[in-house]
């Protein structure tokens, strides 16, 4: 999961780096990306994409997958629809016994007691949580995340320019 559709160069660079890292670990890995622009995502990253708003396709892809990676970039938990959507994805993965990894995400300020509780519940059901800054770490601890949270650098800092340029 990530916000890969609006041609945001930072998010696209993060996605590129995550894809390259995964392919270094397993060159035969089959990666699918949730996107609103399937052709653009394929052209830029050479991976198949599924419409993030097509719940049926997402469920089918999650059922076929080993894991869901919630990818880098700032995650905005200000809108109820986003929180509910993420809760649905995490719950679906749990029901299907799929591993969930939040990788190098940034977590913005979460306000409101109910939003904090829902986000804490969601993050406490994620298998591995890796954030890209100490603010995000502190925010997750503040809202009640009991799971281990690791801090890493933003993946874009290790971005390597390749033949398919995003810049």
Each model region followed by its residue ranges:
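Aromatic- and Gly/Pro-rich donor/ligand-binding loops
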Residues: 1-111, 121, 156-157, 162, ...
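A nucleotide-sugar donor-handling region in carbohydrate enzymes
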Residues: 113-167
């Amino acid at each position: 999961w990530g916000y890969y559709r609006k041609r945001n160069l930072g998010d696209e660079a993060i996605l590129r780096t995550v894809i390259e890292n995964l392919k270094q670990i397993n060159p035969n890995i089959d990666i699918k990306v949730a996107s609103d622009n399937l052709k653009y995502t394929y052209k830029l990253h050479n991976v198949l994409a599924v419409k993030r708003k097509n719940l049926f396709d997402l469920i089918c892809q999650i059922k076929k997958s080993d894991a869901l990676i919630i990818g880098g970039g700032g995650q905005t938990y200000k809108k109820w629809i986003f929180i509910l959507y993420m809760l649905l994805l995490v719950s679906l993965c749990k029901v299907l016994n799929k591993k969930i990894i939040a990788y190098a995400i940034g977590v913005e300020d979460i306000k409101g007691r109910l939003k904090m509780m829902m986000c804490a519940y969601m993050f406490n059901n994620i298998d591995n949580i890796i954030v890209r800054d100490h603010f995000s770490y502190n925010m997750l601890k503040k809202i009640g995340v009991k799971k281990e949270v690791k801090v890493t650098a933003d993946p874009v800092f290790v971005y390597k320019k390749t033949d398919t340029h995003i810049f």
